[in-house]
Curated annotation (Swiss-Prot):
PANTHER family: 40S RIBOSOMAL PROTEIN S15A. One of the primary rRNA binding proteins, it binds directly to 16S rRNA central domain where it helps coordinate assembly of the platform of the 30S subunit. Pfam families: Ribosomal_S8. GO terms for cellular component: ribonucleoprotein complex; ribosome. NCBIfam families: PRK00136.1. One of its GO terms (molecular function) is structural constituent of ribosome. Gene3D superfamilies: 3.30.1370.30, 3.30.1490.10. Part of the 30S ribosomal subunit. Contacts proteins S5 and S12. This is Small ribosomal subunit protein uS8. Keywords: Ribonucleoprotein, Ribosomal protein, RNA-binding, rRNA-binding. InterPro entries: Ribosomal_uS8, Ribosomal_uS8_CS, Ribosomal_uS8_sf.
């Protein structure tokens, strides 16, 4: 069976692995997933990520914990295949008053809502992280 929403699958795998207190979670890789993992690492939500394999690339994400609790408290998919959410630079949402981040796919690449505001671009709001 084909996967309808690979990004939602990635976020669910991360949530499930954190609930099970796993240190690493693996999944099929794609360009979008690697870009989202890079943003999560840059923002300090994950410890690291690695892409392995040539024919069927696999993305391994090293999860991060603080005092035994996951660093990521909430990970939600915003835009989905059935209902895409595109926002202009002025309408980009702030997560929990600026404490969390929205990950946005723009014409300048995948970035946080703060970086998109600084660059003056809007785009598709992929997910929110807190």
């Amino acid at each position: 069976m084909s996967m309808q929403d690979p990004l939602a699958d990635m976020l669910t795998r991360i949530r499930n692995a954190q609930m099970a207190e796993k240190s690493v979670v693996s999944m099929p890789s794609s360009t979008l997933k690697v870009a989202v993992a890079k943003v999560l690492k840059d923002e300090g939500y994950i410890a690291g990520y690695q892409v392995t394999g040539e024919a069927k690339p696999s993305l391994s994400i090293e999860l991060k914990y603080f005092e035994g609790r996951p660093v990521i408290e909430e990970l939600k998919r915003s835009s989905r295949p059935g209902l895409r959410q595109y926002k202009s630079v002025t309408d980009l949402p702030k997560v929990r008053g600026g404490l969390g981040v929205s990950i946005v796919s723009t014409n300048k690449g995948v970035m946080t809502d703060r970086a998109a505001r600084a660059a003056g671009v809007g785009g598709e709001v992929l997910c929110t992280v807190f």
